[in-house]
Design a protein with these regions (language model features):
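Active-site neighborhood of HAD-like aspartate-dependent phosphohydrolases
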Residues: 1-40, 44-48
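Short coil/turn segments at beta-strand junctions that form active-site/ligand-binding loops
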Residues: 1-2, 55-56, 110
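Short acidic, S/G/P-rich loop/turn micro-motifs used as interaction or catalytic elements
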Residues: 11-12, 65-66, 119
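Short, flexible active-site-adjacent loop segments at beta-strand->alpha-helix junctions, enriched
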Residues: 15-17, 63, 97, 136
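Conserved short-loop catalytic and cofactor-binding motifs
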Residues: 30-33, 59-63, 88, 92
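Substrate-recognition element of Asp-dependent hydrolases with the DxDx(T/V) motif
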Residues: 42-75, 94
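C-terminal cap/substrate-recognition subdomain and adjoining C-terminal extension
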Residues: 68-169
Length: 169
C-alpha cells in the first residue's frame, strides 16, 4: 500500500497565517512565507503514517513554478523530511489538478488525502481509498470525509486491519 498527500490546506495551513490568510504564503516575502503554520497534527500524524506505510508515502501537489519553489522552501525550513520521514525525492508537483492521477498511477498510490473534490474525481477508479480533507460539509459517498488529521489517521489505519500481508503492495 502507498499513500499520497496533497500539500496546500492539507499540510500547509495558509488560511491560518498570523498575518491574514493564504495570500501571505503566495504573495508575501520569504519571512512571511516561512511563518505560515502547518495544519494541526499534520507532522505528527504523517510521521506515524510513514511508519505504517513502511516509507511508501509521497507528497503530490498542484501549483505553478513559483509556488513550487516556495513550497520546497517551506518544507525545508520546517524540517518536514526530518520530522515526518518523507524524503525530498518523495515530493512531486504538477501544473493541473487532474495530473495528480499521472503521479498516482506511476507510484501505485492506494490512499490519497486531498482537500479538493475535483482531484478526487480525477483519482476515482484509480486510487481505492480517497480522503476529502478539511472542513467540507460532505462529499460523495465514494470518498471518505476526514476533517482533521486525527480522522485521516483513524480512517487509513482501519484499512490496514486484518491485512498484514498487504502492506508491501
Amino acid at each position: 500500500m502507498r499513500l499520497g498527500i496533497d500539500i496546500g490546506k492539507v499540510i500547509i495551513n495558509g488560511p491560518a497565517h498570523p498575518e491574514g490568510g493564504d495570500t501571505a504564503f503566495f504573495t508575501g516575502d520569504t519571512a512571511r512565507l516561512l511563518r505560515t503554520p502547518s495544519m494541526p497534527g499534520a507532522f505528527e500524524t504523517i510521521a506515524r503514517l510513514v511508519t505504517l506505510f513502511d516509507g511508501r508515502v509521497w507528497l503530490v501537489s498542484k501549483c505553478g513554478e513559483r509556488v513550487e519553489r516556495r513550497t520546497l522552501q517551506w518544507l525545508a525550513h520546517h524540517d518536514f523530511a526530518g520530522r515526518t520521514g518523507i524524503p525530498p525525492d518523495h515530493v512531486r508537483f504538477c501544473r493541473r489538478r487532474p495530473d495528480k492521477a499521472i503521479h498516482c498511477a506511476e507510484l501505485g498510490i492506494t490512499h490519497f488525502v486531498d482537500d479538493t473534490l475535483d482531484v478526487h474525481e480525477a483519482l476515482r477508479g484509480l486510487v481505492p481509498h480517497l480522503y476529502l480533507f478539511g472542513g467540507h460539509q460532505s462529499g460523495p459517498e465514494w470518498l471518505e470525509h476526514t476533517p482533521t488529521w486525527a480522522s485521516v489517521e483513524e480512517a487509513i489505519t482501519a484499512t490496514f486491519a486484518g491485512t498484514p500481508g498487504e502492506r508491501g503492495r
